[in-house]
Amino acid sequence: MSFSADFSIPNTTNAFGYIPTEANYIKPFKRPLSSISPTIVEFPNGTVYISHASAGGSRIITEVAQHLWHVLDQNLTSAESLAQPRMHDQLSPNTVYFEYASAFQHVEGYNNETTAFMKSIGVNIAFVAPGSTTAQALRRLGNGTFEAAGDPRQLNSAGYAI
């Protein structure tokens, strides 16, 4: 029997501790819904600016959104963006998950000031190890060349552009 964490089982939380969703209950010939979110951002002229993909089940969408925010709004490189700490809010349960630091994976983690502030405004917080999501990214630079980056959370992950 094969196992897929993408299917939901009634009254059983998934690998991330999230409640099951009826749309993903196991049924004959059923395919699970997916959070897969390969993303392409284009320049106004239609050429590719960013190509990005992520793995991580329920946490994919928040990883993609954070990567785009870091690159588009904060002007980070793809490698800098992928190395940033991540947070995830599934809405149910009512908890925001923050990555903690990992020197081995070259991830800083969220600082105590950020998480203390969230807690002070009534947010339930929890900490997770880096690596619950991983991603790869490609970005076209202004001179027409590309930068590619692999997630430091994955052992031997890298990007290479010619």
Where do the protein language model's features map onto the residues?
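Hydrophobic, well-ordered secondary-structure elements that form the walls
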Residues: 40, 64, 81, 138
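Compact, glycine/acidic-enriched structural inserts
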Residues: 71-121, 125
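Short, solvent-exposed loop/turn segments at the edges of secondary structure
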Residues: 33-36, 63, 133
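Extended active-site and interfacial segments that coordinate phosphate-rich ligands
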Residues: 1-6, 68, 154-162
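Short, well-ordered beta-strand elements
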Residues: 42, 48-55
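Alpha-helical support elements that line or immediately flank enzyme active sites
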Residues: 53-76
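Active-site rim segments in enzyme catalytic domains, especially the processed small/beta chain
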Residues: 1-44, 74, 78
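In a subset of proteins, long, contiguous C-terminal domains/tails are tracked
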Residues: 109-162
